[in-house]
């Protein structure tokens, strides 16, 4: 384990003593260190009637137990302090470590022995081997009462609200959209779990079209075969109009009553970060949105109608929209328990909705935590004039996603009454998304949140993985740079795939978000501020560093690609084409081994480099015909240890999100040997070689100069490493699978790779 502590806040000594005293650690600033440590530990072991026993089973050094040490005349030393501290954090002395000074350096332990009271205070705010901070572990065990009131420690809310005796209710928010054109505003179901509290509390809202269930069967039927010919497009410039949003006004009157009438029972799945905040005094709201089970309207996937309906839930929390008790719209309830302050959470589609909500500038949305969210839907299902699939899901497109999330069809009566209209709406979607050309058009323009990034007022926290080929890193990169300069923005850029990171051992992500939300939503005045970029170092396990920016580098490193012309044959023998189509993983493996139709260029790294931003290929290229698809991957090549893209379980159900509440696994990205690691990749239709909005002819056998930016990333390379650039046509995981007989030729002498460093 390595410690990477970003959540700790330096407080004045008087605050430290006061907070310790409130938790029963009655330490005196004038006492000697040894006495203070003993006082601290006897309170620490509050679950024991006889505190001599736990002291007797801890060690002060290799010869002395802690009780014997306290009974001796020996002085407290730094070595003894560290030895005791590591044991309190769950490490076994003489098993996990023998020399505390060596272990302190190996783990990056954040505490430097000196002022013992401040050391002990920081120790309580340090994560244990099993994932909780020490103070959270003690509170979970009953250190302070579960009194349904707020208690703070180091600028973070503690788990002092009951997670058993909570209010569970359902309301139906009246949106300002009418997606199915029935003349009535769509209703959106809101599932609420909130702690009991006499005052007003903030809300954690997860906007998830998956929450009410998914129609996997219908979605699978809507998948496309990726086999087909790359379209030869007529040259033209793409014209667009400013997206429009038509809102509807509330209709009719509804009796105001005191409480919701529908009780929330089980929910399909909660998000463990929300679970963590519930006993800390934050309401949990799960909203599926229009076109989902128990709501009304069509599934408009990603447009501002869908976003508006989610926004209206925040409006309700602030008294600007109504919520009914049921679909009759006869009775309404107010969110009189809400303080009006909201944060959004969730990954993938959920993080996408956070991005979209932020761009509305809605009052009350204080923070978004957008994890692996889409910033422009075109870049999810298309790339540079190509029809593409999200990584791992070949054949998926917008209409199959609409079928997946239109969970109203899971209700038989809704299916009978509404499926015909839903299918008619879906046919319009199929026509608009244009799988023929892969071009950007008005349909995608209406789902581009970057156009409204200037409206963002909330503080923004992103998480994204360098190995996320589902929602590719371009999404967070573009959103990060599109935000207004005065907005506080933060990015956790890890080396995983399309995954959550709130239960990783190596970083105090949950506690950092706690510090932020306690400040922004509960009004605690602290100077807590996350760094702009928190980056997971790819060269070592469990190592995180603070950076000033994502991209924007002034310096570049250029690699020449060779001295000759090389060709990429597009067509495969039928047997190989079929084999790769059945299992794209086989294609990826053989591509990395140099066995596919490809140009492979090994580039020695002659000095340490820190890639930060978008690698760019400058290629002189020609096609043997009037079309061309170019794929590129940049690898670090060579057998060595790399971080793996998916977290592994270190210990099962050891993280307590409250008081024995929603226990979850402690995880981490493994660091183990592999033959290569993908650094970045990209795909380009050569007819869109100069601009996404400009389609140009390709003249057979005529040279073209192409500038081709790959996916943004942050990656460290060391002198002696090897980069491998792979250029090819069809990618059997991502692109259309065109097996026509043509080839691309690259003049390597007139081509180069540029890395921003």
From Swiss-Prot:
The active site is at 348 (charge relay system), 468 (charge relay system), 498 (charge relay system). It is found in: Cytoplasm. GO terms for biological process: proteolysis. SMART domains: PepX_C, PepX_N. One of its GO terms (molecular function) is serine-type peptidase activity. It comes from the Bacteria. It is an enzyme of class 3 (hydrolase). Keywords: Aminopeptidase, Cytoplasm, Hydrolase, Protease, Serine protease. The keyword Hydrolase applies. Its EC number is 3.4.14.11. GO terms for cellular component: cytoplasm. Its main location: cytoplasm. It catalyses: Hydrolyzes Xaa-Pro-|- bonds to release unblocked, N-terminal dipeptides from substrates including Ala-Pro-|-p-nitroanilide and (sequentially) Tyr-Pro-|-Phe-Pro-|-Gly-Pro-|-Ile. Removes N-terminal dipeptides sequentially from polypeptides having unsubstituted N-termini provided that the penultimate residue is proline. Belongs to the peptidase S15 family. Homodimer. This is Xaa-Pro dipeptidyl-peptidase. It comes from Streptococcus pneumoniae (strain CGSP14). The gene is pepX.
């Amino acid at each position: 384990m390595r410690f990477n502590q970003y959540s700790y806040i330096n407080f004045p000594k008087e605050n430290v003593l006061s907070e310790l005293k409130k938790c029963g650690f009655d330490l005196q600033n004038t006492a000697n260190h040894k006495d203070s440590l003993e006082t601290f530990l006897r309170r620490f072991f509050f679950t024991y009637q006889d505190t001599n026993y736990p002291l007797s089973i801890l060690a002060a050094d290799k010869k002395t137990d802690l009780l014997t040490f306290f009974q001796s005349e020996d002085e407290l030393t730094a070595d003894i302090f560290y030895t005791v501290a590591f044991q309190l954090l769950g490490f076994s002395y003489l098993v996990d470590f023998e020399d505390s000074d060596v272990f302190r350096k190996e783990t990056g332990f954040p505490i430097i022995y000196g002022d013992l009271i401040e050391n002990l205070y920081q120790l309580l705010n340090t994560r244990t081997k099993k994932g909780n901070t020490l103070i959270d572990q003690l509170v979970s065990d009953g250190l302070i009462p579960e009194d349904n009131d707020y208690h703070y420690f180091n600028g973070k809310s503690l788990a002092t609200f009951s997670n058993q005796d909570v209010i569970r209710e359902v309301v139906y928010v009246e949106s300002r959209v009418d997606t199915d054109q029935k003349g009535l505003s769509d209703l959106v179901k809101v599932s609420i779990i909130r702690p009991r509290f006499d005052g007003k509390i903030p809300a954690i809202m997860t906007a998830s079209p998956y929450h009410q269930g998914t129609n996997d069967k219908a979605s699978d039927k809507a998948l496309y075969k990726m086999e087909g010919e790359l379209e030869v497009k007529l040259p033209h410039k793409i014209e667009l109009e400013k997206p429009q949003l038509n809102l509807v006004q509330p209709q009719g009157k509804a009796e105001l009553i005191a409480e919701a009438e529908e009780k929330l029972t089980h929910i399909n799945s909660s998000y463990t970060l929300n679970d963590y905040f519930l006993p800390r005094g934050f309401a949990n709201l799960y909203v599926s949105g229009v076109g989902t089970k128990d709501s009304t309207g069509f599934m408009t996937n990603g447009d501002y109608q869908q976003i508006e309906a989610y926004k209206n839930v925040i409006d309700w929390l602030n008294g600007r929209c109504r919520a009914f008790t049921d679909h009759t719209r006869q009775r309404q309830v107010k969110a009189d328990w809400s303080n009006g302050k909201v944060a959004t959470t969730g990954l993938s589609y959920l993080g996408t909705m956070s991005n979209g909500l932020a761009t509305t500038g809605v009052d009350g949305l204080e923070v978004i935590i957008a994890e692996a969210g889409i910033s422009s839907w075109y870049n999810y299902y298309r790339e540079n004039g190509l029809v593409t699939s999200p990584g791992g899901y070949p054949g998926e497109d917008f209409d199959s996603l609409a079928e997946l999330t239109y969970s109203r069809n899971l209700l038989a009566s809704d299916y009978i009454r509404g499926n015909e209209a839903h299918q008619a709406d879906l046919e319009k979607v199929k026509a608009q998304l244009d799988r023929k050309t892969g071009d950007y058009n008005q349909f995608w323009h209406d789902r581009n949140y970057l156009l409204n990034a200037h409206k963002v007022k909330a503080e923004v926290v992103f998480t994204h993985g360098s190995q996320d080929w589902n929602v590719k890193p371009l999404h967070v990169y573009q959103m990060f740079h599109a935000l207004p300069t005065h907005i506080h923005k933060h990015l956790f850029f890890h080396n995983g795939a399309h995954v959550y990171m709130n239960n990783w051992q190596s970083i105090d992500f949950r506690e950092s978000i706690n510090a932020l939300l306690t400040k922004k939503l509960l009004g605690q005045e602290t100077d807590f501020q996350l760094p702009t970029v928190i980056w997971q170092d790819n060269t070592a396990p469990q190592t995180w560093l603070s950076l000033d920016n994502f991209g924007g580098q002034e310096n570049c490193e250029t690699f020449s690609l060779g001295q000759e012309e090389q060709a990429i044959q597009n067509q495969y023998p039928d047997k190989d084409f079929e084999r790769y189509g059945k299992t794209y993983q086989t294609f990826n493996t053989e591509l990395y081994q140099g066995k596919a139709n490809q140009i492979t260029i090994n580039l020695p790294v002659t000095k340490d480099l820190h890639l930060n931003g978008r690698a760019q290929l400058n290629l002189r290229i020609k096609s043997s015909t009037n079309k061309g698809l170019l794929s590129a991957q940049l690898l670090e090549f060579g057998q060595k240890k790399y971080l793996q893209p998916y977290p592994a379980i270190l210990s099962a159900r050891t993280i307590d999100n409250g008081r024995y509440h929603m226990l979850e696994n402690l995880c981490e990205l493994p660091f183990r040997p592999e033959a290569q690691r993908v650094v970045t990749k990209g795909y380009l239709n050569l007819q869109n070689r100069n601009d996404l909005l400009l389609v140009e002819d390709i003249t057979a056998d005529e040279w073209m100069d192409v500038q081709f930016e790959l996916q943004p990333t942050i990656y460290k390379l060391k002198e002696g490493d090897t980069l491998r650039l792979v250029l090819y046509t069809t990618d059997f995981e991502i692109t259309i699978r065109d097996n026509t007989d043509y080839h691309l030729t690259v003049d390597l002498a007139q081509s180069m790779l540029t890395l921003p460093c």
